[in-house]
Amino acid sequence: IMINHIGHVPIDGQPPDKAWVEGMEIISKQPNIYCKASGFVELTKDKPSASELDYYRPTMDVLWNLFGINCLVYGSNWPVSERYASYQNVQQLAFRYFETKGSTAIEKVFWENSKEFYKWIDRY
């Protein structure tokens, strides 16, 4: 099961809602549960959305701590995200966060976990 758009928790630069954290904690312990790290900029409800990584960090830290390197999948949510931030800004926010977790995290979150979840087939 893929939880899309981080479970639609509102983002305001503060730690996320306690009930959301508790629910995500319960579901993250189940087998075969992935969470798509997408929708961050849309969930701020601000236009344009914040461009500083620290604004999103409290929510991203919760996701990292619950789903970790093996069950997070990056998604841009483009073109919907374009109403709140440029594609480049959305991707850079995610990249800057996950690069602090190491090169293996980048590979897992940006493509390997997606390949595993969606059962992508190599076509070359």
What are these regions (language model features)?
Residues 5, 35, 77, 106, ...:
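Divalent metal-coordination and catalytic microenvironments
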Residues 61-62, 66-73, 82-124:
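Mid-to-C-terminal alpha-helical segments outside catalytic/metal-binding sites
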Residues 41-42, 78-81:
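Short Gly/Pro-enriched loop/turn and capping motifs at secondary-structure junctions
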Residues 1-73, 122:
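Catalytic pocket-lining loop regions of alpha/beta-barrel enzymes
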